[in-house]
Amino acid sequence: MSEAVPTSARKSRNAPVAPGPAPVLEIESLDMEARGVGRTITEDGEPGKVIFVEGALPGERVTYSSFRRKPSYEQATVVDILRPSVMRTKPKCAFFGTCGGCSMQHLDMRAQVAVKQRVLEDNLWHLAKLRAETMFAPIHGPSWGYRYRARLTVRNVAKKGGVLVGFHEKKSSYVADMTSCEVLPPHVSAMLVPLRRLVEGLSIRDRMPQIELAVGSEVTALVLRVLEPINADDEALLRAFADEHKVQFWLQPKGPDTVAPFYPLDVSLDYTLPEFGIRMPFKPTDFTQVNHQINRVLVGRALRLLAPSRDDRVLDLFCGIGNFTLPLARLSREVMGIEGSDTLTTRALANARENGVDGHTTFACRNLFEVTGDDIRALGAFDKFLIDPPREGALAVSKALAEIAQSGEGPLPKRIVYVSCNPSTLARDAGLLVHEAGYRLKGAGVVNMFPNTSHVESIALFERD
Protein backbone atom coordinates (compact mmCIF):
# COMPACT_ATOMS: atom_id res chain seq x y z
CA MET A 1 0.00 0.00 0.00
CA SER A 2 1.52 3.33 -1.09
CA GLU A 3 1.80 6.36 1.18
CA ALA A 4 -0.76 9.12 0.78
CA VAL A 5 0.58 12.21 -1.00
CA PRO A 6 -0.22 15.53 0.76
CA THR A 7 -2.90 17.55 -1.01
CA SER A 8 -0.57 20.56 -1.43
CA ALA A 9 2.00 18.37 -3.18
CA ARG A 10 -0.63 16.78 -5.48
CA LYS A 11 -1.92 20.17 -6.58
CA SER A 12 1.41 21.93 -7.26
CA ARG A 13 2.24 21.20 -10.89
CA ASN A 14 5.79 22.56 -10.41
CA ALA A 15 6.57 20.52 -7.29
CA PRO A 16 9.49 18.09 -7.74
CA VAL A 17 8.41 14.57 -8.57
CA ALA A 18 10.76 11.61 -8.84
CA PRO A 19 11.04 9.90 -11.20
CA GLY A 20 9.88 12.12 -14.05
CA PRO A 21 10.84 15.32 -15.82
CA ALA A 22 12.30 18.20 -13.83
CA PRO A 23 9.65 20.81 -12.95
CA VAL A 24 9.57 24.15 -14.76
CA LEU A 25 9.66 27.54 -13.04
CA GLU A 26 9.52 31.20 -14.04
CA ILE A 27 12.12 33.21 -12.10
CA GLU A 28 10.82 36.56 -10.85
CA SER A 29 13.67 38.06 -8.78
CA LEU A 30 16.93 37.48 -6.93
CA ASP A 31 17.26 37.17 -3.18
CA MET A 32 20.12 38.49 -1.03
CA GLU A 33 22.13 35.31 -1.69
CA ALA A 34 21.86 35.78 -5.48
CA ARG A 35 19.40 32.89 -5.84
CA GLY A 36 16.62 33.09 -8.38
CA VAL A 37 13.18 33.27 -6.76
CA GLY A 38 10.01 31.90 -8.32
CA ARG A 39 6.69 30.57 -7.13
CA THR A 40 4.88 27.43 -8.15
CA ILE A 41 1.27 27.61 -9.30
CA THR A 42 -1.21 25.01 -8.12
CA GLU A 43 -3.66 23.27 -10.44
CA ASP A 44 -6.28 25.66 -9.07
CA GLY A 45 -4.22 28.61 -10.30
CA GLU A 46 -3.27 29.70 -6.80
CA PRO A 47 0.26 30.67 -5.70
CA GLY A 48 2.15 27.69 -4.32
CA LYS A 49 5.57 27.30 -2.77
CA VAL A 50 8.39 29.79 -3.12
CA ILE A 51 11.38 28.15 -4.82
CA PHE A 52 14.92 29.49 -4.36
CA VAL A 53 17.00 28.34 -7.32
CA GLU A 54 20.79 28.63 -7.30
CA GLY A 55 22.14 29.73 -10.66
CA ALA A 56 18.86 31.16 -12.01
CA LEU A 57 18.26 34.79 -12.95
CA PRO A 58 15.17 37.02 -13.13
CA GLY A 59 13.18 36.59 -16.33
CA GLU A 60 14.45 33.08 -16.94
CA ARG A 61 12.41 29.96 -17.45
CA VAL A 62 14.24 27.03 -15.92
CA THR A 63 13.90 23.46 -14.83
CA TYR A 64 15.17 22.75 -11.35
CA SER A 65 16.01 20.05 -8.84
CA SER A 66 15.19 20.60 -5.17
CA PHE A 67 17.67 19.56 -2.50
CA ARG A 68 15.76 20.91 0.52
CA ARG A 69 11.99 20.96 0.99
CA LYS A 70 10.04 22.86 3.62
CA PRO A 71 6.27 23.37 3.93
CA SER A 72 6.33 26.88 2.41
CA TYR A 73 9.49 26.88 0.30
CA GLU A 74 12.14 24.77 -1.40
CA GLN A 75 15.81 25.25 -2.18
CA ALA A 76 16.97 24.03 -5.56
CA THR A 77 19.59 24.15 -8.27
CA VAL A 78 19.14 24.77 -11.98
CA VAL A 79 18.89 21.72 -14.24
CA ASP A 80 18.34 23.47 -17.59
CA ILE A 81 17.81 27.07 -18.68
CA LEU A 82 14.90 27.00 -21.12
CA ARG A 83 14.83 30.77 -21.66
CA PRO A 84 18.00 32.66 -20.64
CA SER A 85 17.98 36.18 -19.29
CA VAL A 86 19.52 39.02 -21.31
CA MET A 87 21.44 39.77 -18.09
CA ARG A 88 23.20 36.38 -18.18
CA THR A 89 26.90 36.44 -19.00
CA LYS A 90 29.64 33.82 -19.15
CA PRO A 91 31.52 33.52 -15.83
CA LYS A 92 35.16 34.50 -16.12
CA CYS A 93 36.38 32.02 -13.53
CA ALA A 94 36.72 28.32 -14.35
CA PHE A 95 35.83 27.45 -10.76
CA PHE A 96 32.63 29.50 -10.53
CA GLY A 97 29.74 27.37 -9.32
CA THR A 98 31.99 25.13 -7.23
CA CYS A 99 34.02 27.71 -5.33
CA GLY A 100 32.03 29.65 -2.75
CA GLY A 101 34.00 32.86 -3.16
CA CYS A 102 31.66 34.37 -5.78
CA SER A 103 27.94 34.04 -6.43
CA MET A 104 27.16 36.52 -9.23
CA GLN A 105 29.69 35.98 -12.02
CA HIS A 106 26.87 34.77 -14.30
CA LEU A 107 25.14 38.16 -13.99
CA ASP A 108 26.11 41.24 -16.04
CA MET A 109 27.92 43.79 -13.85
CA ARG A 110 25.38 46.57 -14.43
CA ALA A 111 22.64 44.16 -13.46
CA GLN A 112 24.59 43.14 -10.34
CA VAL A 113 24.63 46.74 -9.17
CA ALA A 114 20.94 47.17 -10.00
CA VAL A 115 20.08 44.05 -7.99
CA LYS A 116 22.03 45.34 -4.99
CA GLN A 117 20.32 48.72 -5.24
CA ARG A 118 16.96 46.97 -5.20
CA VAL A 119 17.99 44.88 -2.19
CA LEU A 120 18.86 48.11 -0.35
CA GLU A 121 15.57 49.79 -1.29
CA ASP A 122 13.54 46.69 -0.40
CA ASN A 123 15.17 46.41 3.03
CA LEU A 124 14.55 50.07 3.79
CA TRP A 125 10.91 49.76 2.82
CA HIS A 126 10.00 46.35 4.23
CA LEU A 127 11.92 46.68 7.51
CA ALA A 128 11.58 50.41 8.22
CA LYS A 129 8.84 51.71 5.89
CA LEU A 130 11.34 54.22 4.52
CA ARG A 131 12.18 55.53 1.09
CA ALA A 132 15.23 57.73 0.69
CA GLU A 133 14.53 61.20 -0.66
CA THR A 134 17.35 60.60 -3.17
CA MET A 135 18.98 57.38 -4.37
CA PHE A 136 22.67 58.09 -4.85
CA ALA A 137 24.51 56.96 -7.95
CA PRO A 138 26.18 53.61 -7.18
CA ILE A 139 29.86 53.57 -6.32
CA HIS A 140 31.63 50.97 -8.42
CA GLY A 141 35.07 50.20 -9.80
CA PRO A 142 37.13 47.26 -11.11
CA SER A 143 35.22 43.98 -11.28
CA TRP A 144 38.29 41.74 -11.12
CA GLY A 145 41.51 41.60 -9.14
CA TYR A 146 40.07 43.85 -6.42
CA ARG A 147 40.17 41.62 -3.35
CA TYR A 148 43.11 42.88 -1.30
CA ARG A 149 42.16 40.82 1.75
CA ALA A 150 41.20 37.15 1.88
CA ARG A 151 41.21 34.19 4.21
CA LEU A 152 42.22 30.98 2.46
CA THR A 153 41.73 27.52 3.92
CA VAL A 154 44.56 24.99 3.74
CA ARG A 155 43.81 21.27 3.63
CA ASN A 156 46.06 18.28 2.94
CA VAL A 157 43.74 16.00 0.94
CA ALA A 158 45.25 12.71 -0.17
CA LYS A 159 42.37 12.00 -2.59
CA LYS A 160 43.14 15.27 -4.37
CA GLY A 161 46.83 14.47 -4.61
CA GLY A 162 48.10 16.77 -1.89
CA VAL A 163 47.53 20.21 -0.40
CA LEU A 164 44.66 22.49 -1.42
CA VAL A 165 44.75 26.25 -0.78
CA GLY A 166 41.62 28.24 -1.52
CA PHE A 167 38.12 29.29 -0.55
CA HIS A 168 35.55 26.81 0.67
CA GLU A 169 33.33 25.15 -1.87
CA LYS A 170 29.86 26.63 -2.04
CA LYS A 171 27.94 25.84 1.17
CA SER A 172 30.52 23.25 2.16
CA SER A 173 33.43 22.71 4.52
CA TYR A 174 35.46 21.26 1.64
CA VAL A 175 38.19 23.38 0.08
CA ALA A 176 37.74 24.26 -3.58
CA ASP A 177 40.37 22.69 -5.83
CA MET A 178 41.26 26.05 -7.38
CA THR A 179 44.49 26.98 -9.13
CA SER A 180 43.65 30.63 -9.80
CA CYS A 181 41.18 33.29 -8.66
CA GLU A 182 39.87 36.15 -10.78
CA VAL A 183 38.90 38.42 -7.86
CA LEU A 184 42.29 38.24 -6.17
CA PRO A 185 45.02 40.56 -7.48
CA PRO A 186 46.82 38.80 -10.38
CA HIS A 187 50.08 38.37 -8.47
CA VAL A 188 48.20 36.69 -5.60
CA SER A 189 46.20 34.47 -7.95
CA ALA A 190 49.47 33.37 -9.56
CA MET A 191 50.76 32.32 -6.12
CA LEU A 192 48.01 29.79 -5.37
CA VAL A 193 49.78 26.83 -6.98
CA PRO A 194 53.23 27.78 -5.62
CA LEU A 195 51.63 28.10 -2.17
CA ARG A 196 50.35 24.54 -2.48
CA ARG A 197 53.86 23.32 -3.26
CA LEU A 198 55.29 25.37 -0.39
CA VAL A 199 52.89 23.91 2.18
CA GLU A 200 53.45 20.38 0.86
CA GLY A 201 57.14 20.80 1.69
CA LEU A 202 56.59 21.94 5.27
CA SER A 203 56.83 19.64 8.27
CA ILE A 204 53.52 21.04 9.59
CA ARG A 205 51.50 20.66 6.37
CA ASP A 206 48.73 18.98 8.42
CA ARG A 207 48.91 21.61 11.16
CA MET A 208 48.40 24.79 9.12
CA PRO A 209 44.65 25.26 8.60
CA GLN A 210 44.60 28.81 7.24
CA ILE A 211 46.48 31.50 5.33
CA GLU A 212 45.23 35.07 5.67
CA LEU A 213 46.46 37.52 3.06
CA ALA A 214 46.59 41.30 3.02
CA VAL A 215 47.86 43.34 0.09
CA GLY A 216 49.46 46.70 0.79
CA SER A 217 50.89 49.41 -1.44
CA GLU A 218 54.38 47.89 -1.46
CA VAL A 219 54.11 44.36 -0.11
CA THR A 220 51.73 41.42 0.29
CA ALA A 221 51.57 39.81 3.73
CA LEU A 222 50.69 36.15 4.29
CA VAL A 223 49.69 35.16 7.83
CA LEU A 224 50.19 31.44 8.44
CA ARG A 225 48.04 29.92 11.18
CA VAL A 226 50.47 27.41 12.67
CA LEU A 227 49.25 24.90 15.25
CA GLU A 228 52.80 23.62 15.86
CA PRO A 229 56.17 25.40 15.72
CA ILE A 230 58.02 25.40 12.41
CA ASN A 231 61.51 23.87 12.22
CA ALA A 232 64.72 25.14 10.63
CA ASP A 233 63.94 23.52 7.27
CA ASP A 234 60.50 25.16 7.26
CA GLU A 235 62.09 28.53 8.01
CA ALA A 236 64.44 28.16 5.05
CA LEU A 237 61.55 27.30 2.71
CA LEU A 238 59.52 30.31 3.87
CA ARG A 239 62.45 32.68 3.41
CA ALA A 240 63.14 31.39 -0.09
CA PHE A 241 59.46 31.70 -1.05
CA ALA A 242 59.26 35.24 0.36
CA ASP A 243 62.32 36.32 -1.62
CA GLU A 244 61.05 34.76 -4.86
CA HIS A 245 57.48 36.07 -4.65
CA LYS A 246 58.16 39.38 -2.86
CA VAL A 247 55.86 38.62 0.08
CA GLN A 248 56.16 38.94 3.84
CA PHE A 249 55.32 36.01 6.11
CA TRP A 250 53.69 36.41 9.51
CA LEU A 251 53.06 33.55 11.95
CA GLN A 252 50.03 33.11 14.20
CA PRO A 253 50.51 30.29 16.73
CA LYS A 254 47.38 31.04 18.79
CA GLY A 255 44.84 33.90 18.90
CA PRO A 256 44.96 37.13 16.87
CA ASP A 257 47.16 38.81 19.50
CA THR A 258 49.95 36.30 18.79
CA VAL A 259 50.42 37.37 15.16
CA ALA A 260 54.03 38.44 14.55
CA PRO A 261 56.17 39.11 11.47
CA PHE A 262 58.59 36.33 10.52
CA TYR A 263 60.37 37.39 7.31
CA PRO A 264 61.31 39.88 5.99
CA LEU A 265 61.24 42.35 8.87
CA ASP A 266 62.17 45.55 7.01
CA VAL A 267 58.84 46.07 5.17
CA SER A 268 55.40 47.22 6.31
CA LEU A 269 51.84 47.25 5.03
CA ASP A 270 49.97 50.41 4.19
CA TYR A 271 47.30 51.82 1.90
CA THR A 272 46.80 55.40 0.80
CA LEU A 273 44.00 57.94 0.47
CA PRO A 274 45.63 60.33 -2.04
CA GLU A 275 42.72 62.80 -2.09
CA PHE A 276 43.45 63.62 1.55
CA GLY A 277 47.20 63.03 1.64
CA ILE A 278 46.84 60.07 4.00
CA ARG A 279 49.13 57.06 4.30
CA MET A 280 47.55 54.40 6.51
CA PRO A 281 49.91 51.76 7.98
CA PHE A 282 48.18 48.58 9.15
CA LYS A 283 48.87 45.05 10.29
CA PRO A 284 47.56 42.11 8.25
CA THR A 285 44.95 41.15 10.85
CA ASP A 286 43.62 44.71 11.29
CA PHE A 287 40.23 45.38 9.76
CA THR A 288 40.65 47.26 6.49
CA GLN A 289 38.37 47.43 3.48
CA VAL A 290 38.81 44.59 1.01
CA ASN A 291 38.72 46.85 -2.05
CA HIS A 292 41.24 49.69 -1.82
CA GLN A 293 40.09 51.45 -5.00
CA ILE A 294 36.47 51.55 -3.90
CA ASN A 295 37.50 52.55 -0.39
CA ARG A 296 39.11 55.70 -1.77
CA VAL A 297 35.91 56.63 -3.59
CA LEU A 298 33.79 55.73 -0.55
CA VAL A 299 35.80 57.94 1.81
CA GLY A 300 35.50 60.84 -0.64
CA ARG A 301 31.73 60.34 -1.01
CA ALA A 302 31.21 60.05 2.75
CA LEU A 303 33.11 63.25 3.50
CA ARG A 304 31.34 65.21 0.78
CA LEU A 305 27.98 64.10 2.19
CA LEU A 306 29.01 64.93 5.74
CA ALA A 307 30.45 68.27 4.55
CA PRO A 308 32.61 69.01 7.62
CA SER A 309 33.81 72.57 8.15
CA ARG A 310 36.67 74.07 10.14
CA ASP A 311 34.16 74.91 12.86
CA ASP A 312 32.79 71.36 13.23
CA ARG A 313 33.36 68.76 15.91
CA VAL A 314 32.84 65.34 14.33
CA LEU A 315 32.33 61.98 16.04
CA ASP A 316 33.54 58.89 14.14
CA LEU A 317 31.97 55.75 15.61
CA PHE A 318 33.48 52.32 14.90
CA CYS A 319 36.53 54.20 13.65
CA GLY A 320 38.89 51.22 13.26
CA ILE A 321 42.42 52.33 12.40
CA GLY A 322 41.18 55.77 11.31
CA ASN A 323 39.98 55.20 7.75
CA PHE A 324 37.49 58.08 8.01
CA THR A 325 38.88 59.81 11.12
CA LEU A 326 42.15 60.94 9.56
CA PRO A 327 40.62 62.44 6.38
CA LEU A 328 37.99 64.13 8.56
CA ALA A 329 40.78 65.67 10.63
CA ARG A 330 42.07 67.40 7.50
CA LEU A 331 38.74 69.24 7.16
CA SER A 332 37.34 69.66 10.70
CA ARG A 333 38.17 71.53 13.87
CA GLU A 334 38.21 68.33 15.90
CA VAL A 335 37.43 64.66 15.34
CA MET A 336 36.92 62.02 18.00
CA GLY A 337 37.20 58.39 16.97
CA ILE A 338 35.66 55.64 19.09
CA GLU A 339 36.40 51.96 18.56
CA GLY A 340 35.67 48.83 20.56
CA SER A 341 39.16 47.36 20.22
CA ASP A 342 42.12 48.62 22.27
CA THR A 343 44.47 47.38 19.57
CA LEU A 344 42.74 49.31 16.79
CA THR A 345 42.39 52.42 18.95
CA THR A 346 46.14 52.39 19.56
CA ARG A 347 46.77 51.88 15.85
CA ALA A 348 44.46 54.78 14.95
CA LEU A 349 46.34 57.12 17.30
CA ALA A 350 49.68 56.05 15.79
CA ASN A 351 48.30 56.65 12.30
CA ALA A 352 47.11 60.13 13.29
CA ARG A 353 50.64 60.94 14.46
CA GLU A 354 52.12 59.43 11.30
CA ASN A 355 49.98 61.78 9.21
CA GLY A 356 50.40 64.86 11.38
CA VAL A 357 46.74 65.19 12.38
CA ASP A 358 47.03 64.11 16.02
CA GLY A 359 46.46 67.72 17.05
CA HIS A 360 42.93 67.51 15.64
CA THR A 361 42.05 63.98 16.79
CA THR A 362 41.30 62.10 19.98
CA PHE A 363 40.52 58.40 20.31
CA ALA A 364 38.74 56.30 22.90
CA CYS A 365 37.96 52.63 23.36
CA ARG A 366 34.29 51.96 24.16
CA ASN A 367 31.83 49.12 23.71
CA LEU A 368 29.53 50.73 21.15
CA PHE A 369 27.10 47.81 21.32
CA GLU A 370 26.15 48.85 24.86
CA VAL A 371 26.32 52.64 24.57
CA THR A 372 23.47 54.67 26.11
CA GLY A 373 22.07 58.16 25.75
CA ASP A 374 23.98 59.20 28.86
CA ASP A 375 27.21 57.92 27.30
CA ILE A 376 26.60 60.02 24.18
CA ARG A 377 25.75 63.09 26.27
CA ALA A 378 28.95 62.66 28.27
CA LEU A 379 31.02 63.02 25.11
CA GLY A 380 29.79 66.59 24.62
CA ALA A 381 28.27 68.30 21.61
CA PHE A 382 29.19 67.14 18.10
CA ASP A 383 27.97 68.74 14.90
CA LYS A 384 28.15 65.59 12.79
CA PHE A 385 28.49 61.82 13.17
CA LEU A 386 30.06 59.26 10.89
CA ILE A 387 28.99 55.69 11.72
CA ASP A 388 30.70 52.68 10.10
CA PRO A 389 29.64 49.59 12.08
CA PRO A 390 30.22 45.89 11.39
CA ARG A 391 27.40 43.67 10.11
CA GLU A 392 25.61 43.84 13.48
CA GLY A 393 24.91 47.50 12.82
CA ALA A 394 24.66 50.36 15.31
CA LEU A 395 21.51 49.49 17.24
CA ALA A 396 22.65 50.81 20.63
CA VAL A 397 23.89 54.07 19.08
CA SER A 398 20.59 54.53 17.22
CA LYS A 399 18.58 53.84 20.37
CA ALA A 400 20.75 56.28 22.32
CA LEU A 401 20.10 59.05 19.79
CA ALA A 402 16.37 58.26 19.86
CA GLU A 403 16.36 58.49 23.67
CA ILE A 404 18.14 61.86 23.57
CA ALA A 405 15.69 63.16 20.98
CA GLN A 406 12.62 62.03 22.91
CA SER A 407 13.89 63.34 26.25
CA GLY A 408 14.91 66.68 24.79
CA GLU A 409 17.97 66.56 27.02
CA GLY A 410 21.25 66.81 25.19
CA PRO A 411 22.56 67.92 21.81
CA LEU A 412 22.13 65.84 18.67
CA PRO A 413 24.23 65.96 15.49
CA LYS A 414 22.52 67.75 12.63
CA ARG A 415 23.92 65.32 10.08
CA ILE A 416 24.85 61.62 10.12
CA VAL A 417 26.57 59.59 7.42
CA TYR A 418 26.10 55.85 7.97
CA VAL A 419 28.29 53.37 6.06
CA SER A 420 26.81 49.88 6.16
CA CYS A 421 27.86 46.36 5.19
CA ASN A 422 24.44 44.87 5.96
CA PRO A 423 21.28 46.40 4.44
CA SER A 424 18.97 44.78 6.99
CA THR A 425 20.72 46.29 10.02
CA LEU A 426 21.00 49.62 8.21
CA ALA A 427 17.23 49.54 7.64
CA ARG A 428 16.58 48.66 11.29
CA ASP A 429 18.78 51.52 12.52
CA ALA A 430 17.38 53.93 9.92
CA GLY A 431 13.90 53.21 11.26
CA LEU A 432 14.99 54.30 14.73
CA LEU A 433 16.80 57.40 13.48
CA VAL A 434 13.84 58.56 11.39
CA HIS A 435 10.77 57.42 13.32
CA GLU A 436 12.11 57.97 16.85
CA ALA A 437 15.04 60.40 16.65
CA GLY A 438 13.52 62.84 14.16
CA TYR A 439 15.99 62.51 11.30
CA ARG A 440 15.17 62.48 7.59
CA LEU A 441 16.69 59.90 5.27
CA LYS A 442 18.06 62.35 2.72
CA GLY A 443 19.74 59.78 0.52
CA ALA A 444 21.07 56.24 0.20
CA GLY A 445 22.97 54.21 -2.35
CA VAL A 446 25.00 51.07 -2.87
CA VAL A 447 28.76 50.72 -2.82
CA ASN A 448 29.86 47.76 -4.95
CA MET A 449 32.73 46.87 -2.65
CA PHE A 450 32.53 43.15 -3.55
CA PRO A 451 31.79 42.74 -7.29
CA ASN A 452 30.58 39.29 -8.39
CA THR A 453 29.30 38.51 -4.89
CA SER A 454 25.92 39.15 -3.28
CA HIS A 455 27.47 41.28 -0.53
CA VAL A 456 25.72 44.67 -0.31
CA GLU A 457 27.66 47.65 1.04
CA SER A 458 25.82 50.96 1.20
CA ILE A 459 25.93 54.54 2.41
CA ALA A 460 23.12 56.69 3.81
CA LEU A 461 22.72 60.34 4.79
CA PHE A 462 20.48 61.49 7.65
CA GLU A 463 19.67 65.10 8.55
CA ARG A 464 17.79 66.69 11.41
CA ASP A 465 16.43 70.23 11.64
Swiss-Prot record:
Give me the residues that bind [4Fe-4S] cluster, please.
93, 99, 102, 181
Location of region: Disordered: 1-22
Binding of S-adenosyl-L-methionine: at which residues? 289, 318, 323, 339, 367, 388
Alphabetic keyword roster: 4Fe-4S, Iron, Iron-sulfur, Metal-binding, Methyltransferase, rRNA processing, S-adenosyl-L-methionine, Transferase
Question: What would be an example GO MF term here?
Answer: 4 iron, 4 sulfur cluster binding
Q: Per the UniProt record, which EC number(s) apply here?
A: 2.1.1.190
Q: Where is the active site?
A: 421
Q: Where is the TRAM domain?
A: 16-80
Q: What class of enzyme is it?
A: transferase
- What SUPFAM superfamilies would the database entry show? Nucleic acid-binding proteins (SSF50249), S-adenosyl-L-methionine-dependent methyltransferases (SSF53335)
Keyword check for Phosphoprotein? no
Q: Name one GO biological process term.
A: rRNA base methylation
Which Gene3D superfamilies does the annotation name? 2.40.50.1070, Nucleic acid-binding proteins (2.40.50.140), Vaccinia Virus protein VP39 (3.40.50.150)
Source taxon at top rank:
Bacteria
Which residue ranges does UniProt annotate as crossing the membrane? none
Q: Which reaction does it catalyse?
A: uridine(1939) in 23S rRNA + S-adenosyl-L-methionine = 5-methyluridine(1939) in 23S rRNA + S-adenosyl-L-homocysteine + H(+)
Q: Which PANTHER family match?
A: 23S RRNA (URACIL(1939)-C(5))-METHYLTRANSFERASE RLMD, RNA M5U METHYLTRANSFERASE
User: Its function?
Assistant: Catalyzes the formation of 5-methyl-uridine at position 1939 (m5U1939) in 23S rRNA.
Q: Which family does it belong to?
A: Belongs to the class I-like SAM-binding methyltransferase superfamily. RNA M5U methyltransferase family. RlmD subfamily.
The name this protein goes by in its record: 23S rRNA (uracil(1939)-C(5))-methyltransferase RlmD
Organism equals Burkholderia lata (strain ATCC 17760 / DSM 23089 / LMG 22485 / NCIMB 9086 / R18194 / 383)
